[in-house]
């Protein structure tokens, strides 16, 4: 587990087997991957709405999609499923989780849904896109909330450990700073 390997204490909860108040004691929250769509993922949507602006969050895959939906985005079911597929993507340099990385990165994709670019919420910024135009990264403009559609823990994402390290180190200071 990358987070533990980087020195952080980790507690894992199933998305339907915890009370929201249990999360008060944690410094940061990772919204992990999983099957299905956010509305079918237990307390995931309630968690985001409860802790937005109160706790830093990183959404991975399903967690990324949930962040999008929680703030008003829609999801699109892809005609082509990506499960264990390595593709390049472009990160725009506007999110500190990508600090120190080149604009073009390789990512491991395991999904069939994406956050739709149509009517994208004003409160979110797109931070990375795949070559086929799918949103691969997003962040909230005012809260310390970041999402990545791809899997940083995958061997297909060579710089995934850097992304997690950057997120763990980011303290929300200079949040609106350009990270290009």
Task: Indicate where each model-derived feature is located.
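N-terminal beta1-alpha1 cap of cysteine-dependent amidohydrolase-like domains
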Residues: 1-55, 62, 158-180
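Pocket-forming structural segment of enzyme catalytic cores
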Residues: 47-52, 57-58, 68-145, 150, ...
